[in-house]
Amino acid sequence: MEKVIDCFDGEYAFLSNFYERPVEWEGIVYPSTEHAFQAAKVINPATRLRIAAAETPGQAKRMGRTVQLRGDWEQVKFNIMLDIVLAKFHQHKDLAEALLNTGDATLIEGNTWHDTTWGVCNGVGTNWLGKILMIVRAQLELEAQLENDINS
């Protein structure tokens, strides 16, 4: 039977963008991937720094809802999320190991706040965050395999 991780809390809280672990992205260190993603919605460096200074990921998310989105946001948001999530796991080897330890489990960002783009609510959603995490996991597996091949 296929293993499914359908909630990013408790043992799997590290999968959440609200997990507070610093991530450097485009020259700025953010307290979480949520901070970085919300800041990526704008080009203005001062606005990005204000979002980076938000006290919590939730506050960063609220700030991100009030900014004027960059013109290409709808075209770039999925690739930006991939870039930020990949940076998180490249910069924190313990988190990369934890992600790899999920094996081939299907990762679903289950939620109750009706986010059907990045997750799934009541069985409905495209689960882009879960898909991106599985892409990052596959990338990390390939990188580990390549490193093993080089060192053997």
Short names for language-model regions:
Residues 1-152:
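Charged, low-complexity intrinsically disordered segments
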